Amino acid sequence: MARSAKKGFYVEASLMKKVVNAIESKSKKPIKTWSRRSTIFPEFVGFTFQVHNGRQFIDVYVTDDMVGHKLGEFSPTRTYTGHGSEKGKKK
């Protein structure tokens, strides 16, 4: 179920503070975050975020097309290895 429209978009306060500080200082250093649930705002465009996927941090460069999506959508948590291998099977 989607979030109620009257509540608005969610972004973690600490993440927004980091972005505002980066804008004021004109810093292009990656912003490290564990907040996968935060919505990408237009102010985030052009910044690189290091989003935690449970094991490591994945670099995510934010573009215009990503606005409105969640940061976690661009940091996969699972690796697909495929179903069975043909290698080693005998005919």
From Swiss-Prot:
Belongs to the universal ribosomal protein uS19 family. The keyword Ribosomal protein applies. PROSITE patterns: RIBOSOMAL_S19. Protein S19 forms a complex with S13 that binds strongly to the 16S ribosomal RNA. This is Small ribosomal subunit protein uS19. The keyword RNA-binding applies. It holds the Pfam family Ribosomal_S19. The gene is rpsS. Residues 72-91 are annotated as: Disordered. It comes from the Bacteria. One of its GO terms (molecular function) is rRNA binding.
